Amino acid sequence: MAQRKMIVFPTKNELSEAMAEYTANLSAKFIKEKGLFTVVLSGGDLIDWLCKLVQPPYIDSIEWPKWHVFWVDERVCAWEDPDSNYKLAMEGFLSKVPIPDKNIYAIDKHLAADGNAEHCATLYEECLKNLVKEKIIPISKKTGYPEFDLQLLGMGPDGHMASLFPNHPQINEKQKWVTYITDSPKPPPKRITFTLPVINSTLYNLMAICDKAPAKSVAEIMKHNNLSLPSAHLSAQVENVWYLDQAAASEL
């Protein structure tokens, strides 16, 4: 699996520009190779940092109709709830690019509104397995798990990624592709999340971290490989790259 690689940018704006270029280059590569591009999003500030993709030159050069979009984790709430990662991504990014609705794979609308985390996780995993049958997502010959092209991740101040939190058992799940949590230390408490083997089966993982709040966790991972922090377990099949701004790297 890919070793962790770190790049520090002077400003958040330069990080955002680099993320857009990285994403656009991989989009072109995979669409040329296989005719589609599978992208996994997370929530939080990440969507704001994707703003460069909806500006020239990327807005016009990317083959958006060939994108297939997923979420590494989601809050179990109504789509229109302010906590929804789907709502965040739609308003800040997806509504501004011509990706077909059928290529956007959100949490089940009705189960999410009902707050049923376990059923939401089961149904999202079934969705992924159906897309394997349809040859949208391959199964990795190396890992035996679904193989996405690019995953864009963020890390919380406590070192969590997706909805895999410190001192919670979900980090150890190896059978399921998608699991759930009902006692998230960060509200809202109910969430679904890709399991660690699925996250690490992705070809290219880009972890983007900005601001001072996560700096201590960044240092714990980069200096000491502190495996009590879920983000320290991040890997990838081809590239595991961490983009930091100066504030996030300030404890290194």
UniProtKB/Swiss-Prot annotation:
TM region(s), chain numbering: none
Subcellular location: Cytoplasm, Cytosol
Any one GO cellular component localisation term in the record: cytosol
Keywords: Cytoplasm, Hydrolase
Pathway where it operates: Carbohydrate degradation; pentose phosphate pathway; D-ribulose 5-phosphate from D-glucose 6-phosphate (oxidative stage): step 2/3
Outcome of gene disruption: No visible phenotype under normal growth conditions.
Enzyme class: hydrolase
RNA-binding found in the keyword field: no
GO MF terms held by the record: 6-phosphogluconolactonase activity
CDD domains: 6PGL
A GO BP entry: pentose-phosphate shunt
Catalytic activity line of the entry: 6-phospho-D-glucono-1,5-lactone + H2O = 6-phospho-D-gluconate + H(+)
EC assignment: 3.1.1.31
Role, per record: Catalyzes the hydrolysis of 6-phosphogluconolactone to 6-phosphogluconate.
Protein family (similarity comment): Belongs to the glucosamine/galactosamine-6-phosphate isomerase family. 6-phosphogluconolactonase subfamily.
Protein name: Probable 6-phosphogluconolactonase 5
Lineage: Eukaryota, Viridiplantae, Streptophyta, Embryophyta, Tracheophyta
Gene: PGL5
